[in-house]
């Protein structure tokens, strides 16, 4: 099942789409500079591109952690990104009242993993009519995503994307079950499935409020996921991850973006040049 996002076709058998950008908006200048690099690289490589960033990280572990620029300022920044680069934008919402204002600016609205079973939020998102990206909760099996999908469909919106972001593996660790991609496709009517490699790299230190990460393994994990024939890749970068205000240890250094995507595209092209082989 394919979904249209402006002039971009998103489907498990179509060339992969990059949902890329920064974890959280820090300021206008850094946002535009980062987006400009993404646009330059993706246009050079012929990769369909959607800019991503959060205006508010409402689920930070510590009350003292940076959350973002807020809804009003965030929407102004997204408007400037769209005006300057002419690309679609995705961002996440956390409360029902945010859905309509965000839908008026952004092309895709994201349901955070921790909030994926909140029915009132699901209903408010569905009512916008926008394309919805559903983050799979760390605590949910791939097959259980069908229940969230059904909520959206009952609320009148079937324009859905499913996003893997890792599963809890004991305490303070995440793993990615590569078989889960196929399970989500099978149980949810072959909706587009994308892979959030960045957040799948997170680790926790029991003594710290900040997330750790394994960015050195980003390419290995991304290639493994994309080998399962996915609709897209979800990726966060930063010009200097050590200075990032959220999830720096999992962010790809921005200067490595082109070499990273060259490898992802080569694999995606190879996988999708072959007919689907069904094994019963």
From Swiss-Prot:
Compartments it resides in: Cytoplasm
Catalytic activity, reaction form: D-arabinose 5-phosphate + phosphoenolpyruvate + H2O = 3-deoxy-alpha-D-manno-2-octulosonate-8-phosphate + phosphate
This protein's pathway: Carbohydrate biosynthesis; 3-deoxy-D-manno-octulosonate biosynthesis; 3-deoxy-D-manno-octulosonate from D-ribulose 5-phosphate: step 2/3; Bacterial outer membrane biogenesis; lipopolysaccharide biosynthesis
A Pfam family hit: DAHP_synth_1
GO BP terms: keto-3-deoxy-D-manno-octulosonic acid biosynthetic process
Keyword set, alphabetical order: Cytoplasm, Lipopolysaccharide biosynthesis, Transferase
Highest taxon listed in the record's lineage: Bacteria
GO cellular component, one term: cytoplasm
Top enzyme category: transferase
One Gene Ontology molecular-function label: 3-deoxy-8-phosphooctulonate synthase activity
Matching InterPro entries: Aldolase_TIM, DAHP1/KDSA, KDO8P_synthase
EC number(s) from the headed UniProt entry: 2.5.1.55
Family: Belongs to the KdsA family.
HAMAP family recorded: KDO8P_synth
Record-given protein name: 2-dehydro-3-deoxyphosphooctonate aldolase
Organism taxonomic ancestry: Bacteria, Pseudomonadati, Pseudomonadota, Betaproteobacteria, Neisseriales
